[in-house]
């Protein structure tokens, strides 16, 4: 109940030679006149202090009387009592003992002399006997400042002398290692009494075939428990073999107590007899003997054997009943397990500390279990590989005298009490031996007890006999009457250890003949006990109490035949059940005894009801549940399985973890299992516990209704072929059990028939864990959720085992049944059609044939999540599968609870019911930690973390854990807040008032604008107004700390403007046109939040004025037409010159880029402005743009032909002479001029700088290979512009570069070719053959846009230009032209036409003037100004890429820039001037 109870043990004195004068008590086989005097209790007076109170704490422990006492008293009552005295039934009442748990140093209790371990006897003069623990606590608490305690000192308490100090030792860590190397237990410092070995040792040696020296000593042998000092006759001799401890010769055991280490047996630990300690030693032993004799009176007519204390047992052995000459005795809470054979059991003085270190709780089955340590110490070790020893003593020695290897039933051992301390729960991975033999006594010296038949009293009708096992059969065949009840000590193997077929560690133990089980007995005889060696049967699954149950441990434990439990259940007194409240306490398990046992059961249950109401231990409960379940199974086994072969397979089959194996491995239910141990339920309940349940399909595979598809918590009780489900757990009892079995509960649904059912883990259930699916034979389907995985597996295996048909071999699944069921299922599914299911996702695959069947059922036709892709039923439900799945998923998907819902539906904050909780939480976190965080709300958080928080909040804001690291990132919190407002279905500024806010913000009058905004805000709905008020106040707080976080109102407005002020159907147009208004509205609200949201109406008269000037709004009207469409780069109405550069830039912008449309619009405008500005500056600075550079060249060439409209600075005029061609005669007329005017493109503004030398010269720039287009254009230029004349030669002149024309300007080429054909003369071939002048490498691809340096002094007219001048002229091309040539790839004419036709307009005008052919240019040979003048008209006419306006300007500028000496030459060409003027006028 409270704390960890002490381990109480009897006093096992050291086996010393008993002086003949020492009086023997009744337990020694003789009556004792009176016990030796025992020191009385001490009385202490404690005074309460204000700080510490009384300064001590208590612990409660319940001591049950030995089980032998129960049977003795029952027998006496059956025989009418002994001597007609009063009924000793009162002796069966458990005894409450209260010990001092802790004493505070320096406290009142410490000063008064109270010590840890002292046992309370009286409180304030009032005895605690008969009082509960709570009543004793109440007495102490109700005391005044003075408390009088009567205590039994720990050193003098008979209940603790054997326990000694090891109960208080630390270091309960489990030991891991070899079984033979388990360390010795802590020393015991209480006195022991040794006796001289009797003279009958040779008789024992003769009775044991193997010499003792040949036996490998087992330090854990309970054989060493013989307690000659207490009730062992003086004739009894104990042999101690210390070979395991390195001692070569046996000697009288100074401390034959099993957990006594070697140090404790030294003279310093135990004074020699005769010392001053001896009297107290004798008194202690005699008092304990007297106390025990009072506890266990002998029944009348009982044959006396050497006295031996009854074995006290704990919950772990309660699972293995004890049927011997004495009926199984009541359990002691304090001991784990002790085996006893005969009239009295061995006492154990094992502390749970050491037991935990020994790694396992001890378990004993019955008095026969005593055989295990005794015989195994004497002869078992040598036969360990092949033989299993068994003794079958019965209640009557004449029937089955105990073997000599067993020392008499009464002359061995001591009674012990062990506690269920938490250290019990500890275990190691190496568990080798029998339960009580291995775990509590590891590391102790091996004690081989020798005893002769003379040790038996005269009442013994025949001497004991040693029954030798047959190594070949590994079986012991005792007399038939002894085979009726046989219990085998099971072995607890280490974790994961495989089955060991050696039966050496098993013992067959004889039981009484009250409940014979002939079938089970015959079965055991027939199989020579061999299957008992297998470790796969039911009782092997009983988990040890001191370990966490695991599926892999207990499967290997040794099993117990069914009749063992059956007989023990019929004969046993109440067996301890683990308290559900604590591992410390147990209570009596009610079993079948007789009619007289009902009162005992009721008394025990009622006496310690409180002991089972608090917390409970998993492992203890598991053990009891499993034992209870296995007991039920085994009791029904003979009637259920008529075949002996089936029975044998039941015990030996390991493939189906049957009956109890699965259940212990799967941690049986932990709810209220220990309290359901009534007579009726114990017989037929296989498993029970709390489950969550819902029904999926009703009979014939029909979909269950909505009410049945809800998860409900039920108490499930699994019986033979049914599973009962009730809302409440039924109290144990025959009536309740009968009602439950009949399904008569009012709140209980009809039991689920599990016969031939299919059960497996429900892998498709993803929302709940530990769910298994049950499909019955009539096609009903259920889902059950267990508490944990072990519980789920336990239920599955239990249902599988109980669902088998009668006589079905449990070794494998019934294939025929499954096939038949599968066929029936398919027939039903095809006739009734596919059924829908609620499982959301696909199955991960169910293992085994049954699982395959579950996946293939057509009832799940629509459940594609249950079927593999290749399932046969896919075709049945194929048409409906897609929408069916979508509907299921949509229905299953939980609606969001935080994001994407209206403000009215959000969970409200505590401080303001109209503000969403998520908004309040985020704002509070930011205000608490982020006021000084730089860029708060501007720096985004991690998108993945924000998304995870959104999902968490959508599941329910109640799950918010602010300690989660995701809530520690301020940027994540700020992004979460922005995401909340961004996902609102209706924005904070509602849709119906959005336009009003935009219009109000555009009011010119500042005061009026503020008033209008305030009125609109007040008109918002309640939730929206309150949320906006809360948010703006928060942003105001952030802005107040802008000097640290750098977030001024404007910055916050840039962040929250688009999020708050928007429409539900936000579009691009609104975003572009209203973005400045959105910013301004939010900024105004933040700046004047107090005025906007103030409840004071008077403030309306003091309207604040926005002192700041309105923000400059960029002119973005030109972007509006481009929204949503791709606009061609050129506009027909735009200026051809200004747009040409933009066209060239836009021509290679990828059209597929999403941002191209916006970038093009902006680039066009900027390019136009830049061109215009440069053109204006070019006139004053002497530099020119791409177009102007060519215009200036033509102006210089035309010279005096144009009226002087303007003067150009010197550089442009100086360049002109260098570009003049050889002179022509004034009277020559050029040929017809074909002009190709390509508007809107700037590449025609550049002239080719290659010069043809008179000699036909050299070709430089070998790398500049002309393509077809360039070659064709060169021919056109030379043929058209050249003249044929005698003696004439081709002079240096600028020629058209091929890249000056657009790739698709085929119309211009056609016109030029036709003109060339008309004007071609004798010198055409020479003109064609004229090579281009030298060109420095790289000049054609130069990207220099303009030359800003003034050129060097131009050479005289008619002189050859220098290389520097030629290079300067070549670099005049624009970057756009050069880049266009470089990027252009040769394409087919049609492709080029499709690509470029939309960017250009080609106008070909036939000039009224005739162009000069090559011969005419030759006749104009002679240098001088006249020749140069004669060429200019053609040059002017050749510049067909200029618009009319630009050409006019160029001619005027060129004429003004010519020197005065050239003006006279221009007067001879009046027709050309007039023709040019007419051309411009036409254009």
UniProtKB/Swiss-Prot annotation:
> What are the boundaries of the region Disordered?
15-34, 212-276, 300-345, 385-407, 448-485, 508-527, 827-848, 860-879, 1093-1150, 1171-1361, 1419-1469
Give the record's GO biological process terms.
signal transduction
Specify whether Phosphoprotein is a keyword of the entry: yes
Site positions for Arginine finger, renumbered to this chain? 938
UniProt KW keywords: GTPase activation, Isopeptide bond, Phosphoprotein, Ubl conjugation
**Where in the sequence does UniProt note compositional bias of the Polar residues kind?**
331-342, 1133-1144, 1236-1248, 1440-1457
Phosphoserine PTM positions = 361, 372, 421, 515, 579, 607, 619, 655, 658, 673
Compositionally biased residues, Basic and acidic residues: 316-325, 1099-1110
- Low complexity bias locations: 1338-1351
Residues the record lists as Phosphothreonine modifications: 652
Keyword Transferase tagged: no
What range(s) does the PH domain occupy?
684-804
GO MF terms on file? Answer: GTPase activator activity
Q: Which residues form the Rho-GAP domain?
A: 901-1093
Site of covalent link Glycyl lysine isopeptide (Lys-Gly) (interchain with G-Cter in SUMO2): 850
Residues in domain PDZ?
71-155
Q: Which SMART domains match?
A: PDZ, PH, RhoGAP
Purpose: GTPase activator for the Rho-type GTPases by converting them to an inactive GDP-bound state.
Q: Which PANTHER family match?
A: PDZ DOMAIN-CONTAINING PROTEIN, RHO GTPASE-ACTIVATING PROTEIN 23
By what name is this protein known? Answer: Rho GTPase-activating protein 23
UniProt lineage? Eukaryota, Metazoa, Chordata, Craniata, Vertebrata
Q: Which gene encodes it?
A: Arhgap23
């Amino acid at each position: 109940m409270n704390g960890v109870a002490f381990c109480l043990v009897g006093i096992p004195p050291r086996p010393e030679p008993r002086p003949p004068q020492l009086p023997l008590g009744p337990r020694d086989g003789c009556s004792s006149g009176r016990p030796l005097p025992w020191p009385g209790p001490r009385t202490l007076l404690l005074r309460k202090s204000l700080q510490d109170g009384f300064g001590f704490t208590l612990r409660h422990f319940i001591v049950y009387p030995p089980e032998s006492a129960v049977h003795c008293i029952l027998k006496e009552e059956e025989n009418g009592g002994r001597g007609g005295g009063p009924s000793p039934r009162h002796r069966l009442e458990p005894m409450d003992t209260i010990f001092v748990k802790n004493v505070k140093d320096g406290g009142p209790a410490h000063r008064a002399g109270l010590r840890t371990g002292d046992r309370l006897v009286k409180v304030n003069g009032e005895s605690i006997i008969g009082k509960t623990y709570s009543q004793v606590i109440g007495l102490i608490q109700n005391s005044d400042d003075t408390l009088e305690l009567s205590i039994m000192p720990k050193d003098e308490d008979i209940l603790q002398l054997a326990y000694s100090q090891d109960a208080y030792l630390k270091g309960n860590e489990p030991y891991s290692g070899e079984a033979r190397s388990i360390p010795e237990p802590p020393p015991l410092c209480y006195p022991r009494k040794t006796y001289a070995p009797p003279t009958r040792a040779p008789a024992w040696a003769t009775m044991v075939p193997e010499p003792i020296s040949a036996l490998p000593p087992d330090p854990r042998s309970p054989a060493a428990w013989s307690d000659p000092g207490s009730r062992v006759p003086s004739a009894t001799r104990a042999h101690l073999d210390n070979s395991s401890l390195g001692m070569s010769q046996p000697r009288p055991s100074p401390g034959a107590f099993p957990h006594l280490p070697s140090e404790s047996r030294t003279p310093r630990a135990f004074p020699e007899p005769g010392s001053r300690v001896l009297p107290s030693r004798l008194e202690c032993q005699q008092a304990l003997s007297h106390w025990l004799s009072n506890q266990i009176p002998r029944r009348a007519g009982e044959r006396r054997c050497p006295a031996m204390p009854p074995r006290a047992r704990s919950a772990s052995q309660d699972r293995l009943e004890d049927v011997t000459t004495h009926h199984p005795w009541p359990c002691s809470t304090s001991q784990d397990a002790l085996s006893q054979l005969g009239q009295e059991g061995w006492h154990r003085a094992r502390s749970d500390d050491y037991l935990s270190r020994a790694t396992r709780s001890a378990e004993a089955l019955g008095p026969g279990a005593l055989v295990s340590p005794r015989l195994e110490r004497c002869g078992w070790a040598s036969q360990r590989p092949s033989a299993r020893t068994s003794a079958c003593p019965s209640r009557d020695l004449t029937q089955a005298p105990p073997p000599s290897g067993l020392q008499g039933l009464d002359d061995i051992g001591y009674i012990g009490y062990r506690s269920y301390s938490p250290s019990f729960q500890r275990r190691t991975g190496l568990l080798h031996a029998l339960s009580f033999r291995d775990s509590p006594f590891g590391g102790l010296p091996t004690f081989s007890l020798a005893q002769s038949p003379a040790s038996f009293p005269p009442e013994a009708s025949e001497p004991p006999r040693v029954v030798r096992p047959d190594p070949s059969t590994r079986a012991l065949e005792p007399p038939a009457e002894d085979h009726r009840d046989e219990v085998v000590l099971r072995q607890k193997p280490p974790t994961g250890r495989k089955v060991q077929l050696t039966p050496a560690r098993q013992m067959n133990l004889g039981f009484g003949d009250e409940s014979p089980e002939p079938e089970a007995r015959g079965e055991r005889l027939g199989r020579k006990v061999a299957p008992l060696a297998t470790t796969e049967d039911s009782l092997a699954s009983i988990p040890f109490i001191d370990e966490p149950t695991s599926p892999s441990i207990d499967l290997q434990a040794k099993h117990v035949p069914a009749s063992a439990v059956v007989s023990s259940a019929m004969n046993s007194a109440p067996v301890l059940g683990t308290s559900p409240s604590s591992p410390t306490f147990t209570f009596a398990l009610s079993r079948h005894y007789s009619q007289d046992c009902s009162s005992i059961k009721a008394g025990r249950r009622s006496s310690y009801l409180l002991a089972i109401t608090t917390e409970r231990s998993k492992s203890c409960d598991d053990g009891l549940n499993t034992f209870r379940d296995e007991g039920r199974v085994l009791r029904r086994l003979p009637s259920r399985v008529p075949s002996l072969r089936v029975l044998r397979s039941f015990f030996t089959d390991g493939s189906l973890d049957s009956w109890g194996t699965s259940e212990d491995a799967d941690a049986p239910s932990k709810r209220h299992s220990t309290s359901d141990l009534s007579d009726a339920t114990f017989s037929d309940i296989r498993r029970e516990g709390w489950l969550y349940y819902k029904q999926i399909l009703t009979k014939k595979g029909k979909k269950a209704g909505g009410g049945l598809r809800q998860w409900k918590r039920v108490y499930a009780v699994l019986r033979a072929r049914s599973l009962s489900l009730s809302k409440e757990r039924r109290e144990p009892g025959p009536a309740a059990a009968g009602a439950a079995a009949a399904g008569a509960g009012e709140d209980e649904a009809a039991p689920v028939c599990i016969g031939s059912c299919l059960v497996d883990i429900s892998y498709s259930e993803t929302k709940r864990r530990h769910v298994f699916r049950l499909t019955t034979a009539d096609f009903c389907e259920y889902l059950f959720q267990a508490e944990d995985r072990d519980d789920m597996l336990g239920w599955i295996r239990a249902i599988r085992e109980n669902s088998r048909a009668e006589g079905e071999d449990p070794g494998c699944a019934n294939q025929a049944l499954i096939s038949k069921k599968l066929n029936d299922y398919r027939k039903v599914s095809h006739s009734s059609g596919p059924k829908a299911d609620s499982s959301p996702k696909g199955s991960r695959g169910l293992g085994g044939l049954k699982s395959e069947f579950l996946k293939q059922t057509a009832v799940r036709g629509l459940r594609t999540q249950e079927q593999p892709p290749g399932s046969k039923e896919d075709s049945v439900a194929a048409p409906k599968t897609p929408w069916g799945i979508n509907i299921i998923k949509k229905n299953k998907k939980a609606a969001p609870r935080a994001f994407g819902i209206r403000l009215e539906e959000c969970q409200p904050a505590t401080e303001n019911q109209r503000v969403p909780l998520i908004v309040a939480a985020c704002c509070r976190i930011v205000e608490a930690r982020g006021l000084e965080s730089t860029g708060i709300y501007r720096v985004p958080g991690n998108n993945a973390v924000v998304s995870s928080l959104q999902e968490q909040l959508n599941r329910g804001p109640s799950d918010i854990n602010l300690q989660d690291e995701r809530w520690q990132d301020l940027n994540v919190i700020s992004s979460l807040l922005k995401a909340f407002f961004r996902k609102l279905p209706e924005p904070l500024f509602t849709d119906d008032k959005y336009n009003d806010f935009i219009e109000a913000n555009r009011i010119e009058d500042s005061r009026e604008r503020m008033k209008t905004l305030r009125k609109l805000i007040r008109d918002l709905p309640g939730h929206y107004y309150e949320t906006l008020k809360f948010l703006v106040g928060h942003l105001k707080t952030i802005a107040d700390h802008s000097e640290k976080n750098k977030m001024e109102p404007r910055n916050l407005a840039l962040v929250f403007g688009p999020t708050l002020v928007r429409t539900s159907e936000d579009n691009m147009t609104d975003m572009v046109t209203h973005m400045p208004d959105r910013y301004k509205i939010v900024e105004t609200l933040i700046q004047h939040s107090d005025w906007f949201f103030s409840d004071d109406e008077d403030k309306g008269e003091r309207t604040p004025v926005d002192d700041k000037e309105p923000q400059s709004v960029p002119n973005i009207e030109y972007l509006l037409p481009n929204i949503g469409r791709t606009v061609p780069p050129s506009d027909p109405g735009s200026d051809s010159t200004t747009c040409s550069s933009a066209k060239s830039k836009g021509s290679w912008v990828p059209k597929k880029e999403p941002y191209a449309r916006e970038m093009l619009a902006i680039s066009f405008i900027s390019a136009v402005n830049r061109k215009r500005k440069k053109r204006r500056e070019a006139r004053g600075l002497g530099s020119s743009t791409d177009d102007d550079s060519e215009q200036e060249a033509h102006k210089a060439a035309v010279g005096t032909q144009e009226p002087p409209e303007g003067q150009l600075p010197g550089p442009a005029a100086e360049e002109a002479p260098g570009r003049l061609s050889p002179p022509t005669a004034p009277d020559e007329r050029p040929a017809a001029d074909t002009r190709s005017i390509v508007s809107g493109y700037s590449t025609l503004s550049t002239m080719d700088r290659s010069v043809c030398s008179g000699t036909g010269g050299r070709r430089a720039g070998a790398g500049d290979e002309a393509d077809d287009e360039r070659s064709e254009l060169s021919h056109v230029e030379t043929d058209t512009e050249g003249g044929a004349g005698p003696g004439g030669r081709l002079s240096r002149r600028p020629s058209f570069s091929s890249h000056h024309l657009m790739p698709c300007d085929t119309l211009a080429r056609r016109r030029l070719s036709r003109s060339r054909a008309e004007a071609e003369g004798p010198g055409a071939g020479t003109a064609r053959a004229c090579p281009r002048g030298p060109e420095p490498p790289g000049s054609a691809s130069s990207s220099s846009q303009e030359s800003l340096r003034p050129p060097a002094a131009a050479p005289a007219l008619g002189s050859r230009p220098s290389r520097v001048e030629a290079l300067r002229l070549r670099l005049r091309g624009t970057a756009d032209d050069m880049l266009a040539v470089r990027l252009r790839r040769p394409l087919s004419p049609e492709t080029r036409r499709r690509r470029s036709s939309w960017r250009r307009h080609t106008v070909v005008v036939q000039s009224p003037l005739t162009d000069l052919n090559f011969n005419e240019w030759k006749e104009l040979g002679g240098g001088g100004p006249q020749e140069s003048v004669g060429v200019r008209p053609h040059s002017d006419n050749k510049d067909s890429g200029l618009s009319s306006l630009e050409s006019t300007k160029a001619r005027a500028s060129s004429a003004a820039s010519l020197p005065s000496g050239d003006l006279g030459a221009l007067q001879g060409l009046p027709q050309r001037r007039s023709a040019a003027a007419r051309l411009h006028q036409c254009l």
